[in-house]
């Protein structure tokens, strides 16, 4: 069983890498490769450190929902992490001439459907959390670019490593024009992601656990079990629709997801 000292040491290792932008060794030497409870405890500790600096929770992200990304990461199940206000860089391409790479360690980018919740998802029992329930809780769907990142050197991760590292979260960009679910069916969307005009990733809604709304249901169950249910106003990044890809300073990334506005993000040093 993982000790509190080992959990604390893992939190400190990842927090230092996050603050210095210098990648660290994996934390599986401290928490093992099978102790998910310990991995999520490390994640909680890492998030609490950010909250202590004034950041606040705005939602959740679901990771490793597509087979392509699971293969890229070498994992076989999804996970989740927290979204903080400081991760939102939706306006930086327009306001600052690009998103600074100095905030990142080893970033990759992926396109996905995000959901803005209009209702809490906290029914009397876990069995009540159905796709129909979470669909009803969604206010709007929006296109998203997630800039995933790993504080662990060379992305040398097992499942517990990525969970501990807040599900390899980094930054995100979301569209300004939301679409109600009466106008778009998430599982049917098609996605193309280009870098400097060249397609680098493609996929569809069915690649995300069969349906992004199924991914949302899965997340709602996990949050319910952890005693921290999804709430009205939360943003949920539901998971990649295709493989994630690396990018560099000076790159222009565009994501086209059918039924949504095209998203553009530019990156600088």
Question: PLM ranges: what are they?
Answer:
Residues 2-211, 252, 260-269:
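Catalytic-core "active-site belt" of small-molecule-metabolizing enzymes
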Residues 214:
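Glycine-rich, small/acidic residue-mixed loop/short-helix segments
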Residues 32, 221-223, 238-240:
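Short alpha-helix capping/helix-loop boundary micro-motifs
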Residues 227-234:
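Beta-rich strand-turn-strand
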Residues 237-238, 255:
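A generic structural signal for residues embedded in beta-strands
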């Amino acid at each position: 069983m993982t000790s509190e000292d080992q959990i604390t040491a893992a939190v400190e290792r990842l927090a230092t890498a996050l603050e210095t932008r210098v990648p660290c060794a994996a934390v599986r030497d401290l928490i093992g490769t099978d102790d998910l409870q310990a991995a999520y405890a490390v994640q909680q500790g890492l998030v609490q450190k950010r909250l202590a600096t004034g950041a606040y929770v705005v939602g959740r992200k679901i990771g490793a929902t597509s087979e392509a990304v699971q293969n890229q990461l070498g994992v076989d199940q999804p996970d989740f992490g927290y979204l903080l206000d400081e991760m939102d860089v939706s306006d930086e391409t327009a306001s600052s001439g690009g998103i600074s790479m100095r905030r990142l360690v080893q970033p990759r980018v992926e396109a996905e459907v995000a959901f803005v919740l209009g209702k809490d998802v906290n029914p009397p029992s876990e069995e009540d959390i159905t796709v129909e329930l979470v669909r009803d809780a969604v206010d709007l769907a929006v296109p998203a670019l997630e800039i995933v990142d790993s504080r662990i050197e060379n992305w040398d991760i097992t499942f517990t490593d990525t969970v501990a590292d807040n599900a390899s979260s980094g930054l995100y960009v979301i569209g300004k024009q939301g679409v109600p679910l009466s106008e778009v069916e998430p599982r049917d969307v098609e996605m193309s992601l280009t870098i400097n005009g060249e397609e680098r990733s493609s996929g569809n809604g069915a690649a995300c656990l069969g349906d992004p709304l199924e991914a949302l249901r899965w997340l709602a169950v996990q949050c319910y079990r952890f005693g921290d249910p999804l709430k009205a106003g939360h943003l949920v990044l539901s998971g990649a629709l295709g493989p994630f890809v690396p990018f560099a300073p000076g790159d222009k990334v565009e994501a086209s997801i059918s039924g949504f506005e095209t998203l553009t993000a530019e990156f600088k040093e």
